[in-house]
Amino acid sequence: SSLKLSDSDKGKVLVGKGALEDYIAVLSQEIYGIHHVKVIVKLEDQCIDVRINASIEPGINIPETSGEIKSNVRETIKKVTGIEVKEIELFFKQIKAKEE
């Protein structure tokens, strides 16, 4: 499934759900201490709901890091696609060091 970014007499621009999920996973992993990210996007009416499942390194401040992830995802998705991110739910499945 996909979300329409624009529609004109010259054609449509769509972005796929999978493309958004992959991009949000990359954005989430840009934040220090976050790894093993899986993203689920739910398409709404010209906006999206996001669930991010991730692991976080021990000793990382979870509330602060969660805020960074949410801000980064919201701002970047809006800037790059024009899509509003309605809700972001974060689930940390593990507090564990990243294995190299």
Task: Indicate residue ranges for each PLM-predicted region.
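Elongated extramembrane "stalk/tether" segments
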Residues: S1-V37, K42-D45
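Short edge beta-strands and adjacent turn/loop segments
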Residues: I31-E57, F92-A97
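Short amphipathic alpha-helical segments at helix-loop
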Residues: L5-D9, N53-P58
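Cytosol-/stroma-facing membrane-proximal "stalk/adaptor" domains immediately downstream
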Residues: P58-E100
